[in-house]
Amino acid sequence: MQPTPFSSLSSADGCWTGLRLAQGLFIPDVAVPDDALSCVVVQGGTVRWVGPVAAVPPAFAALPRHAGGGALATPGLVDCHTHLVYGGHRANEFAMRLAGASYEEVARAGGGIVSSVKATRAASEDELFAQALPRLQALLDEGVCAIEIKSGYGLALEHERKQLRAARRLGEACGVTVRTTFLGAHALPPEYAGRSQDYIDLVCREMLPALAEEGLVDAVDVFCERIAFSLAETEQVFQAAQALGLPVKLHAEQLSDMDGARLAARYGALSCDHIEHLSAEGIAAMKAAGTVAVLLPGAYYTLRDTHLPPIQALREAGVPMAVSTDHNPGTSPALSLRLMANMACTLFRLTVPEALAGITTHAARALGLQDTHGLIAAGRPADFVLWPFAEAAELAYWFGHQPPQAIVRQGRVVQR
C-alpha cells in the first residue's frame, strides 16, 4: 500500500510509519532500539499501538500507511498558562520598563492589569474572540494541542463571563483542547479601590458560583502578591472553589515570598506558577501535594528579572516542572512555546529533557490532563506532531520560524 501525502489527509487513522521517537521522554513502556524507526497506529482518532515498524501487529496491516520519512514525533505541545483573551495591548508599558519602571511602578501608575481591564470591558465577546483567534492560531501552528486560557481582565461578572465564553468558543472553532481558568482575583478593579474584602466577597459569593453553574470554569486561580491579594484573601477564594469541586492553582511567589505555595499545596493545587521567590518550605509542600511548578521565562525576560526560580532545589525534590508562554499583553506577549523552552534552558538552566517534558508531560499534569495529553501512548487521543529534526534537542535549540511537518490534533490531520 502506497503512503498517503499528509496534505491530502483529514482523518489521522492509519499506520504512521518511519518515525523517530525520543525514548524515555515521550513514550512510556515502549522499547524501541535506538537505530530503529517506529510506528504510531491510529484508529477512530485514538492511538492504538506504538512500537518498532518491524513489529506492527498483523491486525493493523490493512490500515492506510502514512510515511514519516524519519521525522521526529512528539506529543502535541501543551501551553498550560495563558491569558490569551483580552482587549487591546500594552506596548506603551514596554517603553516605561525600558526607562526603568518596575512591574509594581507600572501598576501603580495605572498601567498593568488594570489597563487591560479597561480595554477588555470595552470590547464585546465577539471582538474578544476575533482578537484572540490569531494569537491562538500562532500557537497551534507551532504544534500546541492543548492550552489553558484564563479570565482575569474583566473583574466583573459580565466581563469575566465574556472572556470565558470567548475561550470556550476558541476551542470549538479551532478543534483544540481548551481548559478555562477563572482568575477573577487577578487585580482589584478601580471601583473597589480600598475595598479588597468586598471584592473578594463578590468573587466568592457571586462571580465564581454563577460562572461555574454555566459550565465555564475548569479551574480557579488567584494572583497572591503584595500588589494583588493577600494570603487570607487567596484562601477565601480557594475555599469557594473547593466547595464547588473545582481544582485550584496559584500565581505564587513571583515578586516576593508570600508563602502562597504552601497554601496552594494544602488545597491540592494543580500548579504554582512563576515561583521565582519560592522557599524551601514551599517546595516541600508542593512535592507532598503533587503540585506542578510552572516556569514562565517569558515574563522573567520581559521584566528583566534577576531572581531565578530555585531550579536545582525543585529538581532535587522531584517536583515536576512545566514551562509555559504566560501569554499576556503586558509582561509576556509571547506566541512561541518552543521559544519558552529555549529560554527555560538558557535562562533557568533546565536540561533539554526537562524543558521538553515541561511543554508536554508536566504541562498536561498542570492542567489535570495527564491521562489524555502530553504522551504518545496506546489508548490516548491522537495528538502528536512531526518535526523536521534529527534529534529531540533541536526542539529547544532552534528558535524562530521552524514549522512542524505535520500536526495531528484530536485525531485529525491539521491542514495549514
From Swiss-Prot:
Fe(3+) binds at residues 81, 83, 251, 326. It is an enzyme of class 3 (hydrolase). 4-imidazolone-5-propanoate binds at residues 90, 153, 186, 254, 331. Binds 1 zinc or iron ion per subunit. Zn(2+) binds at residues 81, 83, 251, 326. It catalyses: 4-imidazolone-5-propanoate + H2O = N-formimidoyl-L-glutamate. One of its GO terms (biological process) is L-histidine catabolic process to glutamate and formamide. The keyword Membrane does not apply. Its cofactor is Zn(2+); Fe(3+). N-formimidoyl-L-glutamate binds at residues 153, 328, 330. Pathway: Amino-acid degradation; L-histidine degradation into L-glutamate; N-formimidoyl-L-glutamate from L-histidine: step 3/3. Its EC number is 3.5.2.7. Pfam families: Amidohydro_1. GO terms for molecular function: imidazolonepropionase activity; iron ion binding; zinc ion binding. One of its GO terms (cellular component) is cytoplasm. Coiled coil: none annotated. It comes from the Bacteria. InterPro entries: Amidohydro-rel, HutI, Metal-dep_hydrolase_composite, Metal_Hydrolase. SUPFAM superfamilies: Composite domain of metallo-dependent hydrolases, Metallo-dependent hydrolases. Keywords: Cytoplasm, Histidine metabolism, Hydrolase, Iron, Metal-binding, Zinc. Catalyzes the hydrolytic cleavage of the carbon-nitrogen bond in imidazolone-5-propanoate to yield N-formimidoyl-L-glutamate. It is the third step in the universal histidine degradation pathway. Belongs to the metallo-dependent hydrolases superfamily. HutI family. PANTHER family: IMIDAZOLONEPROPIONASE, IMIDAZOLONEPROPIONASE-RELATED. This is Imidazolonepropionase. It comes from Paracidovorax citrulli (strain AAC00-1) (Acidovorax citrulli). The gene is hutI.
